[in-house]
Amino acid sequence: MSVTVLSLQSHVVQGTVGNSIAVPVMRAMGVRAWGMPTALLSNHNGRSSVAGIPIDSEQIDAMVNALDSNGELKHVDAVLSGYLTPRTGPAVLRTVERCRALHPDTIWVCDPVMGDMTPDGELRAYVPDETVSLMTDAVQHADVVVPNLAELGILTGTEPRTLDDIVRAARSLTGPHLVIVTSMPYHCLLYTSPS
């Protein structure tokens, strides 16, 4: 039996982020991946020019309601969330709750898309403060959190530079069972449990 993942992320025309890359990769691995857009964008939000079509909570709720009416939502084993906006975040949180109510073992993997490191090594947020607040709350309810180094700093109010800083910051996140930090300047894979 195949694993089913509901992937709630942005879809971009140009680039390999969000559902534009996650869904094809998961499908190639034999996962039943369902891509639901949280934003339709021209490209990655960190670029100098971005255009898009807004998605709101009502549209996400309607798509989730249709999946539920068709008897499909109960098959979701995991929810993967990525780029969220204040308009879509509440619906994504409701979707996770609905999936867990139908299938209590549903895992939520949250990629708190909020920023990146600049070429000169500065941590930079490219989302509004409302989104930072939303993500800070969301990660407390997720099972797995997958921040990049900048996002880890944004979530923890730190500027992790050394491996010890990174481990300390990852362990300070409350809520998730597992924190996987990506895009570190070290040749290792770091994962940690907050406790």
Summary of predicted features, one role per range:
Residues 191-195:
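Conserved small/polar residues in nucleotide/adenosyl-binding loops
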Residues 2-110, 114-122:
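Conserved N-terminal subdomain of the carbohydrate kinase-like
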Residues 27, 139, 174:
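Anion (oxyanion) recognition and catalysis
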